[in-house]
From Swiss-Prot:
Pfam (any one): Lon_C
HAMAP family: lon_bact (MF_01973)
Full protein name: Lon protease
Lineage of the species this protein comes from: Bacteria, Pseudomonadati, Chlamydiota, Chlamydiia, Parachlamydiales
Domain Lon N-terminal, chain residue ranges per copy: 36-234
Organism expressing this protein natively: Protochlamydia amoebophila (strain UWE25)
Induction profile: By heat shock.
Alphabetically ordered keywords of this record: ATP-binding, Cytoplasm, Hydrolase, Nucleotide-binding, Protease, Serine protease, Stress response
Gene that this sequence comes from: lon
GO MF, one example: sequence-specific DNA binding
Reactions performed catalytically: Hydrolysis of proteins in presence of ATP
Domain Lon proteolytic: 646-828
Active site residues per record: 734, 777
InterPro entries, per database record: AAA+_ATPase, ATPase_AAA_core, Lon_bac, Lon_bac/euk-typ, Lon_lid, Lon_proteolytic, Lon_Prtase, Lon_prtase_N
GO CC annotations on file: cytoplasm
Length: 835
């Protein structure tokens, strides 16, 4: 900081500079010092002929400035540092360029925060000859470099070119005009060296480029370098000018549009036809309501919200909330219903056209249509389709909507954990919106659509609520007539909606939810059904999608059977369709290759004899047979469901039912030497199956005297029961009679009847209880080639409901006690010997 008062310093500086006045300037000009103080410059060098300000901060250089101001010559040397990052107070002569300028102090203006602003006039080029002081400040002997005064024709041409370039710059940047006036006051354009220095000083060239010009003493080379830098500056100024023009044009257009809109508003107000955005919003909402029959309680809410909208400021946050709320309220199709199709014959054709089989579901939809026709309208229903993946649960929903002439909306609830997805969010939350039910009505624009809730058995729970519980109100015919969405907060009638729910299993669906649904089971398809589906639906559809024709590609009946048996044994037809697509894609590649080869041959023939007409391409007919199937699909994935062609002792085949459909299940028993009679169970059996094994073990212990009097088996051996495919978890009670039969086969050392399968839950007293999945198990038995089956007697009604083509070719015995199972399993009991 300055120690002396600012006024005193300024007076001192003025007194020191008075020597520049009153004809003493010429005297000083003749007294160029041989030794000067040197001030380092960091950013860019100065050139002779310039006048420029320089800020001197408090410190050593400020003290030097005081000394210079009191000297006779009042001159300092200004030299550029070699590095722009140099520390100004630690710079030595080795850190400076050798060429700089001599600057004369014209005026010193002290600053309040300390230091001073110095107005300098650049006099001459100088060269640092010999440093004389390098302690706190820099001082050196200097020599002066004079320009050659001779003006050649070439230099004159260069000068004219520089002047014309400067004129162009003045047009683009008026700021250069002031600097040009200062130069004209101190210099003459007939001196090309000074003109080059001035031109370079106008540019924004790098410090190294400027220093290079400063160190160029040859006037011809200097003016050439100056012209190059000046041309670069002109190019930059032109580019900057174009950018500014574009920006100004955009701004001016926006301002013009704004003023025109304001004028238009003013004119409309004067004419009485002004309508702002708020009025337009209100008119839009009111226009929607004219097309709808809105319930009175909902209309009351809409009216209140419209009044609130009219008094709110459009810029307020609440305005957008109210506007969004009204948008939803007026978009719901209040009182709008699709005209239903009550023609049974037409509906039956649509359902038959889209899907093969599924008679239970088709019959249920026809019942729905029939009741609607007689009752002049029918309330919505809730149908639950349960079955393994790929059997057509989702696609049948679209067909049902088409058959009823209703709009269709599907969404998956699998993995859903937030009840707000069903019932909506409260309007107080940011980004709130109605639930899926209201969204479905808005999308369909009718109050009686078909809404499908896919994968309802895979819903989850979280701290955000239980979506399954939220569905209780939606799927209850007695409650959904007054469904309340959290966002709308008004009653909405869902009683006309036909809900279709799909699931793979019922076990994970809560009982209250199951109780509200009409459950229809879609069992897996058997061979005959898959063949018909492939021929009538899958092959024609995919052949058309891939641009293939029926004459080009065909499948034999045997090939389709081989695909189903060897590659696609799952209950549905999704994997079967993927395999057919794979075959068709490979055939498409083959046909395209044939066509390319044909085109090449035709092109060659056309070159050799131009007169011949090209022959049209006729693709080779491709027929898929069992012999060439491996070329498309590789080796078969499945060989046989049966481990044994002839059932050995201690082995019995059971029937299982999973989410993927029916399957066969072997129960194997062997005896192991041991001191104690113990039963061991392996094969990833669940808790229920373990209990079934214990029941079977106890039943055999208590009843063996009936089947093999006088046996001593349990006194000698331990028993190990195993369920093959140990990596697959298994559970359920239906293997009870199978386990008993396996144990008795082991004890009696007699195999069970060949091609026999059984299923049924067993009690400790030998009663056989009913099981589930009759159709699925029958399909699995047919796939495995079983000829005789044993089912619980209580499942007879399920069996009789099955189509004849599923029951045909298999003998089924219905039993209610294990004694009957024993007689069927071991028909030659009188020939058995005891072990």
């Amino acid at each position: 900081m300055l120690e002396e008062p600012i006024d005193a310093l300024e007076t001192e500086f003025e007194n020191a500079l008075n020597s520049l006045e009153d004809n003493q300037l010429s005297k000083i000009n003749g007294q160029l010092p041989e030794q000067v103080h040197v001030f380092p410059l960091l950013r860019r060098p100065f050139f002779p002929g310039m006048a420029a300000p320089l800020v001197i901060e408090p410190g050593p250089f400020y003290e030097v400035l005081k000394v210079v101001a009191k000297s006779d010559h009042k001159c300092v040397g200004l030299v550029l540092t070699r590095s722009e990052q140099a520390e100004i107070y630690k710079v030595g002569f080795s850190d400076l360029y050798q060429i700089g300028v001599l600057a004369r102090v014209l005026r010193i203006i002290p600053m309040e925060q300390g230091g001073a602003q110095v107005i300098l006039n650049m006099e001459r080029r100088i060269k640092i000859e010999k440093p004389t002081s390098e302690t706190k400040t820099l001082k050196a002997n200097v020599s002066y470099i004079e320009d050659d005064p001779i003006l050649t024709t070439e230099l004159k041409a260069y000068a004219i070119s520089i002047l014309s370039t400067i004129k162009e710059l003045l047009k683009l940047n008026p700021l250069f005009k002031e600097e040009l006036q200062i130069f004209l006051g101190h210099s003459d354009f007939t001196e090309p060296g000074k003109l080059a220095d001035f031109a370079v000083a106008l540019t924004t060239a790098s410090r190294e480029e400027l220093q290079d010009v400063l160190e160029t003493f040859d006037i011809r080379k200097r003016i050439d370098k100056a012209l190059i830098l000046l041309k670069k500056e002109l190019d930059i100024s032109i580019l900057q000018h174009n950018i500014n023009q574009k920006i100004e044009a955009t701004i001016n257009k926006s301002q013009k549009d704004f003023f025109l809109r304001e004028q238009l508003k003013t004119i409309k107000k004067e004419l009485g036809i002004e309508r702002d955005d708020k009025s337009l919003d209100r008119e839009k909402f009111e226009a929607r309501l004219k097309e709808r029959v809105v319930p009175s309680d909902v209309m009351k809410v809409i009216t209140e919200e419209l009044e609130k909208l009219s008094v709110l400021d459009m810029q307020s946050a609440e305005y957008s909330v109210v506007r969004g709320y009204l948008d939803w309220l007026t978009t719901i199709p209040w009182g709008i219903y699709s005209q239903e199709n009550h023609n049974l014959e037409e509906a039956e054709k649509i359902l038959a056209h889209d899907h093969y089989g599924l008679e239970d579901i088709k019959q249920r939809i026809l019942e729905f249509i029939g009741v609607g026709k007689l009752a002049k309208g029918v309330r919505g229903s809730i149908i639950c389709l349960v079955g393994p993946p790929g059997v057509g649960k989702t696609s049948i929903g679209k067909s049902i909507a088409r058959a009823l002439n209703r709009k269709f909306y599907r969404f998956s609830v699998g993995g859903m954990r937030d009840e707000a997805e069903i019932k909506g969010h409260r309007r107080t939350y940011v980004g709130a919106m109605p639930g899926k039910m209201i969204q479905a009505l808005k999308y369909c624009q009718t109050m009686n659509p078909v809404i499908m809730l896919d994968e309802v058995d895979k819903m989850g729970k979280s701290f955000q609520g239980d979506p399954a519980s939220a569905l209780l109100e939606v799927l209850d015919p007695e409650q959904n007539a007054e469904f309340l969405d959290h966002y709308l907060d008004v009653r909405c009638n869902l009683s006309e909606v036909l809900f279709i729910v799909t699931a793979n299993v019922l076990d994970t669906i809560p009982e209250p939810l199951k109780d509200r649904m009409d459950i229809l089971r879609l069992s897996g398809y058997i061979m005959q059904e898959k063949l018909e589906i492939a021929k009538k639906y899958l092959i024609p559809r995919n052949r058309k999608e891939m641009g293939l024709k029926a004459l080009e590609v065909s499948f034999t009946q045997e090939a389709l059977r081989s695909i189903i048996n060897g590659y696609a044994r799952e209950s549905g037809v999704r994997n079967l369709e993927n395999l057919l697509k794979k075959i068709l894609r490979k055939l498409a590649v083959n046909i395209v290759r044939e066509q390319e080869e044909h085109d090449k041959e035709q092109a060659k023939k056309k070159k050799s004899s131009r007169s011949k007409k090209p022959i049209a391409f006729v693709p080779t007919k491709h027929s898929i047979t069992p012999s060439n199937l491996k070329d498309f699909l590789g080796k078969p994935v499945f060989t046989s469901d049966r481990f044994y062609e002839r059932t050995p002792v201690g082995v019995c085949m059971g029937l299982a039912w999973t989410a993927m459909g029916g399957a066969t299940l072997y129960i194997e028993s062997i005896k192991v030497a041991g001191e104690k009679t113990v039963m061991k169970l392996t094969g990833q059996a669940g808790d229920v199956m373990k209990e079934s094994a214990e029941i079977a073990w106890s039943y055999v212990h208590s009843s063996i005297h009936k089947y093999a009097p006088g046996y001593t088996f349990f006194e000698k051996s331990q028993v190990h029961i195993h369920i093959p495919e140990g990596a697959t978890p298994k559970d359920g009670p239906s293997a009870g009679i199978t386990m008993v039969t396996s144990l008795l086969s082991l004890i009696l050392d007699t195999p069970v009847l060949d091609n026999l399968g059984m299923t049924g839950e067993l009690t400790l007293t030998g009663r056989v209880l009913p099981i589930g999945g009759v159709k699925e198990k029958l399909v699995a038995a047919r796939r495995s080639g079983l000829k005789v089956l044993i089912f619980p007697k209580d499942n007879l009604r399920d069996y009789e409901e099955l189509p004849e083509y599923i029951r045909k070719g298999i003998t089924v015995h219905f039993v209610d006690h294990y004694d009957q199972v024993f007689k069927i399993s071991f028909p030659n009991k009188h020939q058995m010997k005891l072990c």
